[in-house]
Amino acid sequence: MNNLKWVAYFLKSRMNWIFWILFLNLLMLGISLIDYDFPIDSLFYIVSLNLSLTMIFLILTYFKEVKLYKHFDKDKEIEEIKHKDLAETPFQRHTVDYLYRQISAHKEKVVEQQLQLNMHEQTITEFVHDIKTPVTAMKLLIDQEKNQERKQALLYEWSRINSMLDTQLYITRLESQRKDMYFDYVSLKRMVIDEIQLTRHISQVKGIGFDVDFKVDDYVYTDTKWCRMIIRQILSNALKYSENFNIEIGTELNDQHVSLYIKDYGRGISKKDMPRIFERGFTSTANRNETTSSGMGLYLVNSVKDQLGIHLQVTSTVGKGTTVRLIFPLQNEIVERMSEVTNLSF
């Protein structure tokens, strides 16, 4: 904020003083006009001296009182303002003390709530890890099932449980995702194939195959774990809303950027739903009776893609299917973005 604005604010806040002083001086001038015995020259001298002293007083008061608010305008911490004793007047000191008490109390609440959130996150993480043990044991038991039809049905349900546990684990780690990322060149094809293998029990039951076509060098600079999570959620949606149609997966190269597309021929997304597909908990308005969707998959994808520098495009036609395209960044773009984030944090 420039000095002229500060002067305007100060004068506006002292306008009652200024009007009162002007009123008193005009009153004296008025009295002198009525009382002819009162020397007019002496009165003009007194009024001029009074106004001059008032002007000096206002200037000194301005520099004394505005100093604190200039520190506020620079976003100084209240602790620094209190520690350096930047408040000049008793009212300013009272205001600073009040703000300090309130902000300190709020900070204590935030710290307490953060500790509770951390404990909650740790509890859920431990729960997911603990429950993974019997789920893994369940898989070994299912593999021993002789009846192939029953085995396939059990593997389908097991895959859904395992996928939901992984999704819950990623949700709890969202807040700490930046600390949990490690960027390196990884094979996009390898990640896609690994995720297809994890979903094979679901795809087999639903009669869905995969047409994979990698035409370009598929090594991308990303974090393996979080990138696989994005691919998994998109594949999960494609499988969930498709039936007896193959899912097409491939890569393209545009402006040196590798892009991965996943195309299904399912029911598609309506135009009115499209702006809301990334909202937490949002499910299709066209199928309100559906209970298998949690509305968390694309929310997770949207929450992570920016940290990975991935540009996401979704196109869909109702009754014809959906295409999701992931455009991966170059290494220098990731390094530049991370440098900007680091500078902002300081």
Swiss-Prot record:
SUPFAM superfamilies xrefs: ATPase domain of HSP90 chaperone/DNA topoisomerase II/histidine kinase, Homodimeric domain of signal transducing histidine kinase
Keywords assigned by UniProt, alphabetized: Antibiotic resistance, ATP-binding, Cell membrane, Kinase, Membrane, Nucleotide-binding, Transferase, Transmembrane, Transmembrane helix, Two-component regulatory system, Virulence
The Histidine kinase domain, residue ranges: 126-332
GO biological process terms, semicolon-separated: cellular response to phosphate starvation; response to antibiotic
Coiled-coil region list: none
Pfam families referenced in this protein's UniProt entry, alphabetically: HATPase_c
GO molecular function terms noted in the UniProt entry: ATP binding; phosphoprotein phosphatase activity; phosphorelay sensor kinase activity
SMART domains given in the database record: HATPase_c
Compartments where located: Cell membrane
The protein's Enzyme Commission number: 2.7.13.3
Cellular component terms (Gene Ontology): plasma membrane
Membrane topology, record value: Multi-pass membrane protein
Known catalytic reactions: ATP + protein L-histidine = ADP + protein N-phospho-L-histidine
PROSITE patterns: HIS_KIN (PS50109)
Source superkingdom: Bacteria
Ranges that cross the membrane: 15-35, 43-63
Principal subcellular localisation of the protein: membrane
Quaternary structure and interacting proteins, as annotated: Interacts with GraX.
Function: Member of the two-component regulatory system GraR/GraS involved in resistance against cationic antimicrobial peptides (CAMPs). Functions as a sensor protein kinase which phosphorylates GraR through the auxiliary protein GraX. In turn, GraR up-regulates many genes such as adhesins, exoproteins, transporters, toxins, and proteins involved in cell wall synthesis. Down-regulates the expression of many genes involved in RNA and amino acid synthesis or glycolysis.
Annotated PANTHER family: HISTIDINE KINASE, PHOSPHATE REGULON SENSOR PROTEIN PHOR
Protein name in UniProt: Sensor protein kinase GraS
Organism name: Staphylococcus aureus (strain JH9)
